[in-house]
Amino acid sequence: MKFISTFLTFILAAVSVTASSDEDIAQVPAEAIIGYLDFGGDHDIAFLPFSNATASGLLFINTTIAEAAEKEQNTTLAKREAVADAWHWLNLRPGQPMYKREANADAWHWLQLKPGQPMY
C-alpha cells in the first residue's frame, strides 16, 4: 500500500495547480455524463486504473482495509505442537456405542427397525 500512496503522491504533486478559467474547463454535454461519484470527506479511498483481457476501468480501493490485509499477509506463521492422545487399540465392550454422542442427544438405546420405517 505504501507504493500506491507514494505513486499517487508523486502523480498528484506533478499536476500543476492553477486557477481555472471558463476557457480551460472542458465542455461536456449532459447526455455524455454517465455518473458522478462524490468522495466528500473520505480520505481513505484510492483509485487505480485497471485493465485485463476482458475489462478495463477504475479500481476503487479502501486503503484502510488494504493496509490491514497487507499486515495479515506479512505476519509469519509458527508451527504449534499437536496435542493428541497416545495411540491405542479401540476397545469395544458389549452395549457400548462406537462413537461419542452429541451433548444434547437422546440417551443411548438399541436401534429399533420397524417395517417401512426409514433408518434415519
Curated annotation (Swiss-Prot):
Keywords: Cleavage on pair of basic residues, Pheromone, Repeat, Signal
One term under GO cellular component: fungal-type vacuole
Signal peptide boundaries: 1-21
Pfam families: MF_alpha (PF04648), MF_alpha_N (PF05436)
Gene Ontology terms, MF aspect: cupric ion binding; mating pheromone activity
Propeptide residue range(s): 22-86, 102-107
Keyword Signal included in the entry's annotation: yes
Domain of life: Eukaryota
One of the protein's GO biological processes: mating
Functional description taken from the UniProt entry: The active factor is excreted into the culture medium by haploid cells of the alpha mating type and acts on cells of the opposite mating type (type A). It mediates the conjugation process between the two types by inhibiting the initiation of DNA synthesis in type a cells and synchronizing them with type alpha.
Name assigned to this protein: Mating factor alpha-2
Organism of provenance: Saccharomyces cerevisiae (strain ATCC 204508 / S288c)
Gene coding for it: MF(ALPHA)2
